[in-house]
Amino acid sequence: LDIYGARIEITTTEPCFAAPIAGLADDSDISDCIIKDTYVSLTDSAKMWGTGGIAGFGSGNLDNITTDVTLVCVDTDAAVRDEQFMGGAYAAGFLNIRNCSITIDGYDSDHGYVHDGGLVGMYMVYPLELSKTYQGEVLNNKVKGMITFFEDNTDRRAYCQANMGEVMNWTYAYSGFTSDFKRNETYDYSVTLLPEMCSNPSYSDTVTEATAADFGYTTHTCSTCGYT
């Protein structure tokens, strides 16, 4: 399965996980995919929510997947101390990740607790009984990119790492991880963080024609800021 140029934009007040393949992955196997030039944006005011580059929340296996995704989380209720998750592979849960190449451009504006990771926002095994015996695998993965975020909260967590934002259960084999990742925290809480920050963007279009082996696509480039 290859996904090119998907655009997912969700606005809700309910708990929600958004991702290109599965918002909820329940003991799911996802393998040998390419997810390219894909944009996932979730605007929410719920207590728990997030975005992922492959899957949202859950369990299972991710193998041999290449991604190039833009992820956006916008928290719209400053009074709620929410738990927000963003991950280049998945937002939260305990999926195994093996031989995956993740490119992430993340933007997270949150007034609660941030859990952001180049691979996983938060690694957590559930239910509790399973967490006592479960042995997972996070092997031979690479991450490239940046997550720009703010956490507008005096009781701060601000979890953001190249691999996993927060780890609740250290119950997995881990090796072969490489990264070229930037943790970019900002402190102007009045400005919602988005990939396109121009108030009046001006776009030029470049068409790449389809071939027998590849899909065609159009690249839109802002002449003001260079965003594509």
Locate predicted features.
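Extracellular modular ligand-binding repeats in secreted and cell-surface proteins
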Residues: 196-228
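Predominantly extracellular/luminal carbohydrate-interaction, adhesion, and secreted-enzyme modules
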Residues: 1-197
